[in-house]
Amino acid sequence: MNIHEYQAKALLKGYGAPVAEGVAILKAEEAEAAAKSLPGPLYVVKSQIHAGGRGKGKFKELSPEAKGGVRLAKSVEDVVANVKEMLGNTLVTAQTGEAGKQVNRLYIEDGADIERELYCSLLVDRSVGKVAFVVSTEGGMDIEAVAHDTPEKIQTIAIDPETGVTAADVAKISSALKLDGAAGEDAKSLFPLLYKAFNEKDMSLLEINPLIVMKNGHLRVLDAKMSFDGNALFRHDDVRALRDETEEDAKEIEASKWDLAYVALDGNIGCMVNGAGLAMATMDIIKLYGKEPANFCDVGGGAGKEKVAAAFKIITADPKVEGILVNIFGGIMKCDVIAEGVIAAVKEVGLKVPLVVRLEGTNVELGKKILNESGLAITAADDLDDAAKKIVAAING
C-alpha cells in the first residue's frame, strides 16, 4: 500500500524527522488560508498523486509550456494562481503512463534554501536478509538513471537487526553522503529514526528524494515516499486509515476484498493462475509468443468457487482484455472447483472474448468434464505451451 507525500511526512515528523511545515488542500478556496499559515515568503505547491516524476510531468489540460506538477511560488497570490491551474487536472509523468492521474489534492509547503540534494532510501535487501540504506550524493533525480549510468555513486549499507543503526552505521552513511558539521550532527538522530519508522510500520520502501542539506547546514526531508507491506496492515489501523482508493486501480481494490493477488498490467491477455511462480511463467510465455499480459492474478491455493468467479469477473471487467488464459495446477486447489467457478462467472457476466483453460492436477478429468459439458465456448489446452499458442492464435484471428 502506498500513501501520499504529505502523509508520509506527517508520519516521519511524528518520529522526529526534520520536515517543512505544510498544508494539504482539496479545494482551491483553501489555498490562500493554507499559504498564509506558513512562514513564507517562498512556497512549493505539490501535486499529490501516487507516482514519481511529478516535477517534470505535464498537465493534459494545459499548454506544453505550462509548469509541471511541483511548482515554486513567491507569494500567496502566486500560490493561489498555481492551485487553480493544477487542482482537478490530469498530470502525466514518466510513471503514470499516457492516461496520467487526476490531481485531487495539493500540498502547499514552506520553501527551503537548498545547498545540496541527496538520495536516501530504506528497503529490504533480500540478498543479505536485512534492511539496508541505499544512498547517493545524486539526489533530486531519477535514481534508476543514476544506477544505470553511474552505479558507483550509489552505496548500500545493510543494518544488523540485532543492533539497529549503530554509530558506525551512521558514520558510513554520512561518509557516503559527505555529511559534516550541522548536517553530520543531524544525521546521528535522523538515520536511526528512519530505521525505527521503517521497522515499526512494516514498510517495504521508505524513499527520501531529495534529502537536502540547507544553506544553514542542516538536513531536511524534502520529499518522502512510503510503501507498506500489505500482509502486515492488519496490525496498523493508523496506516490503513491513510489509504486513498482514488489513487488505486478499481480492479485491484475489488481483488483485495477477495484476498486475490492482482496487479493490473498494460497488455491484452487476461491471466488467472494459482501460484505466483506459475503466474510469472504464464506471463513469460504469453510474451514469448508476441503478446502482453493484462494482469497478474494469483487466486491462491485454497480458493473456492466464489473466489474464482470473483477473479474471473475482475479480469473481464478490464476493457483492454481481448482474451483470457486460465492456467491451473491443482494441488490444494482442485480442478473441478476452478471449472465450476469459471462457468459460474461466465454465465453471470457473459463471454465476449476467447477463453483458453489449461488444467492439470487434482480432479483434472472431472474439471475437464465440467467444462466440456457446460456448452460454453471454452477452448481446452493440454499444457502451458499449447495454452499460450491457442490464446494468441484466437486473438490474432
UniProtKB/Swiss-Prot annotation:
UniProt: substrate binding residues: N274, G331, I332, M333
Residues holding ATP: K46, G53, R54, G55, E109, A112, E117
A Pfam family it matches: ATP-grasp_2
Key word Metal-binding present: yes
Cofactor note: Binds 1 Mg(2+) ion per subunit.
EC code: 6.2.1.5
Cofactor(s) this protein cannot do without: Mg(2+)
Superkingdom classification of source: Bacteria
Residue stretches making up the ATP-grasp domain: 9-254
Keyword line: ATP-binding, Ligase, Magnesium, Metal-binding, Nucleotide-binding, Tricarboxylic acid cycle
Disulfide partners: none
Pathway assigned to this chain's UniProt record: Carbohydrate metabolism; tricarboxylic acid cycle; succinate from succinyl-CoA (ligase route): step 1/1
Broad enzyme group: ligase
Record's protein name: Succinate--CoA ligase [ADP-forming] subunit beta
Highest classification ranks of the organism: Bacteria, Pseudomonadati, Pseudomonadota, Alphaproteobacteria, Hyphomicrobiales
Name of the coding gene: sucC
